[in-house]
Amino acid sequence: MEEKDKEEKVTGENLEPEDKNLEQEDKEEVVGPQEEQQIDEAKNWEEEYNKLLDEHNRLKNQYLRLYADFDNYRKRTQREKEELLKYEGMEFLKKLLPVLDNFERALKEKDTDPQKVIEGVELTHRQLLEILNQHEVKAIEAQGQPFNPELHEALMVEVREDLEENTVIEELVKGYFYKDKVLRPALVKVSKKQ
């Protein structure tokens, strides 16, 4: 009986390593050519995925940089625009300062020589008109013209049989264009028939 037990033990011991070898062989057999191809394809897909992920990250970073650059550009142009609007009249005002200087000179002469005051005022008037002309400010012709509500504002009406109705008789306050827009309408007196 002991021999049988020994044989069984030997046989059992011998079977176990064989079983292990069989399992390994089964595992190796499971990975056949088709499975190897699938594994290779999976590796290729993984490589492709990683490449696409890298490209995605690169493009995302590029987008974020461009977005930040554009945001900085927008902020900078807004600041420049605000500064430009804040100081837009500065050059025009610099041109007006000599006009003010001439007025002050003319006023200094008011007690000594009235003719010098008149000459100073005339000079200042010409200088101011020249500056306005340089900035495309032009007078609106009103006297003798047909009344135009876009250019004139009627303050008074006078009955006149010798003129056509709605003719500007008198310009009370001069009107001006700035480029092609009315800066200020002319204040006028208009004719009316009885």
Swiss-Prot record:
Q: Where is the composition biased (Basic and acidic residues)?
A: 1-24
Keywords, comma-separated and alphabetical: Chaperone, Cytoplasm, Stress response
Coiled-coil ranges per UniProt = none
Q: What are the recorded Gene Ontology BP terms?
A: protein folding
Q: Name one GO cellular component term.
A: cytoplasm
Compartment(s) = Cytoplasm
- Which Pfam families would you find in this protein's record? GrpE (PF01025)
Is Cytoplasm a UniProt keyword of this protein?
yes
A GO molecular function annotation here is: protein-folding chaperone binding
Tagged with keyword Nucleotide-binding? no
- Region annotation (Disordered) ranges: 1-41
The protein's matches in PANTHER family, at most eight in alphabetical order, are given as:
GRPE PROTEIN, GRPE PROTEIN HOMOLOG, MITOCHONDRIAL
What's the family? Belongs to the GrpE family.
Q: What does this protein do?
A: Participates actively in the response to hyperosmotic and heat shock by preventing the aggregation of stress-denatured proteins, in association with DnaK and GrpE. It is the nucleotide exchange factor for DnaK and may function as a thermosensor. Unfolded proteins bind initially to DnaJ; upon interaction with the DnaJ-bound protein, DnaK hydrolyzes its bound ATP, resulting in the formation of a stable complex. GrpE releases ADP from DnaK; ATP binding to DnaK triggers the release of the substrate protein, thus completing the reaction cycle.
Fill in the subunit field for this protein: Homodimer.
* Name this polypeptide is given: Protein GrpE
Question: Source species, please?
Answer: Carboxydothermus hydrogenoformans (strain ATCC BAA-161 / DSM 6008 / Z-2901)
